[in-house]
Amino acid sequence: MQNLKKYLVNGLKNTLLFKNNAGISHNGPWKQIYADTQLDRWHVGEFSSVEYTISADFDTNNKEIIKVLITATRDRASVVVYARNNTLNDIIEVTATVNDSYVDVILNPVIDGDLTPTTDFTGAKVIYTAQYFHTQTPLVV
């Protein structure tokens, strides 16, 4: 295992500082996207919001990265895609469902019959990162 002290030191305001402009890279394991693929699940009693970065890869010409915010209560989930960049087309759609216990983050491939030829991104591969924000006010039944 790498010695993390080579790359990290204490930063200002209780942060971690990466030495020598070091960065973070992400690679798998990936999920393949079909209809209603569950990307993530979290309990609303533990977390209230999550920020996702999702990278989708369909083939050599179709790549996409999106930034998504999801905030939820026991009976409502709000999804905001606030940044999206791709090489040709949107590849995935993001939704969330919630019940009294947990939030499911759901991905669907874009299937667009209006394009010529018909565009179907079923089977695209995605990887993601998530930053979870804890619930500050406990749920009351």
Predicted regions and their residues:
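Low-complexity intrinsically disordered segments
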Residues: N85-V141
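Hydrophobic residues embedded in beta-strands of well-ordered beta-sheets
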Residues: L16, A77-S78, S101-V103
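Short, flexible beta-strand-to-coil junctions
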Residues: T53-E64, L69-T73, P109-D112
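Surface-exposed ligand/attachment interfaces on beta-rich extracellular proteins
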Residues: N21-S49, D57-K63, V141
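Short, low-complexity N-terminal tether/leader segments at secretion or assembly junctions of large
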Residues: M1-A22
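Short, hydrophobic/aromatic-rich segments at coil-to-beta transitions
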Residues: E46-T53, S78-V80
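Broad, structure-driven detector of short, well-ordered beta-strand segments within folded domains
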Residues: Y7, E64-A72, I92-A96
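Terminal beta-strand-rich extracellular "head" domains
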Residues: T71-E93
